[in-house]
Amino acid sequence: MLPARPTSWKGHEVLIKAVAALNRPDVTLLLLGAGDGAPRFVAGLEQLARKTGLDGRLRIAAGSDDMPSALMLADVIAMPSTVPEPFGRVAVEAGAMGRPIVAFNHGGAVESVLNGQTGWLAEPGDISDLSRALGTALDLSQEKRAELAKKSRAHIIKSFSKEKMCQKTLEIYDELLQNRARTSDNIIR
């Protein structure tokens, strides 16, 4: 599943191609949120699905008011943004829910996804590498999936909880104030 607004740089087309390359008739791709896009955008995704052989295995839906439930229904959460996202909330939300994440190795995903532990990071723009990572995630045994979920939740709590984010923000303010004080001291001398 790709939970993302209907914007071309979110990687909908890249993901369709990567899922098609898996050549697995048991896999259905859900583009959650893409259904809110302009009819031309949606039609383009449907046309690409037909062209790549995903016809009948692509679902395009509007956004959900209950993202935790939507995330729990997915076997894998994909973040194939073609442009690095500064934070990428989807990876943190999916990690908190213990879902395997597959993303490109750039932007916020570099911090939120621990490659091989809480998900997989593919080479940016490399559809074959993204497809390989998706296959790895889909092939996880129940035992490995449970282990990944535990690691993923622990990583998110440790690194992205409200308390941790406040602590990091205050540390930045403190550093800026110390730098300002040092600069002021140098000017006075």
For the regions a language model picked out, list residue spans one by one.
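Nucleotide-activated donor-binding/catalytic signature segment of Leloir-type glycosyltransferases, i.e.
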Residues: 42-64
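Short acidic alpha-helix that forms the nucleotide-activated donor recognition element
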Residues: 20, 59-74, 96, 114
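Short hydrophobic beta-strand element within catalytic cores of glycosyltransferases
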Residues: 100-103, 113
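A short, well-ordered alpha-helix in the C-terminal region of glycosyltransferases
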Residues: 136, 143-159, 168-171
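A conserved mid-protein helix/loop that constitutes part of the nucleotide-sugar donor-binding site
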Residues: 7-21, 43, 128
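Conserved acidic donor-binding segment of nucleotide-sugar-dependent glycosyltransferases
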Residues: 115-116, 120-127, 136-142
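Acidic donor-binding loop of glycosyltransferase active sites
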Residues: 72-86, 99
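Glycosyltransferase donor-sugar binding loop
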Residues: 3, 28-43
